[in-house]
Amino acid sequence: EYRRQRQMCIRDSYDGDVMSDMVSTAFGSLAMMTSVLVAPDGTTEYEAAHGTVTRHYYRYLQGEKTSTNPMATIFAWTGALRKRGQLDGLADLAAFADKLEAASLDTIRAGVMTKDLAGLVEGPAPKAVTSEDFLHAIRARLEA
C-alpha cells in the first residue's frame, strides 16, 4: 500500500530502494537520482540514491582517471544547501543551490557529460569526459 503526496511515492525503506532503482533504469542512470529522507520531526537528509562507487574511488586513489557521474551527489548537496538556506533565512545560499543545479544541467545540455550518459545520447556524439573534467566544466558555467 502506498500514499501519494504531491509527486512523491512514500514507501517502506526496502520497498522504496527497490522501486527507485527500477524507476532510475528508465532514465538510464542511477547517478541522476537523489533521495530525500524526512523524519517525523522535520529533520531532513539529502543523499545520492546510488550510494558510493568504491570501484571508481579506488581507481582514483591509484591515480587513474574515472568517469563517475557526480550529478546525484551535486543535487544532494544543493538540496541540503537550499534547505539550510530556507531554515536560516539565507536567500543567497538557496540561490547558489539553484545556480549550481542550473550550471550542472546546462553542462549536460551543452553535450559535456560523463561516460554513462554519453552512451545514452542519440544523434551527434556528446563529449564524454572524466569526473574531474565534468566538474571543471560545471564550475566554468557557474562562474561565467
Stretch-by-stretch model annotation:
Residues 1, 40, 70, 124-126:
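Proline-rich intrinsically disordered, low-complexity coils
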Residues 1-9:
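Single conserved hydrophobic/aromatic residue that forms the stacking wall/gate
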Residues 11-99, 106-107:
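Glycine-rich phosphate/nucleotide-binding loop
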Residues 62-68, 83-144:
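Internal helix-turn-beta structural module
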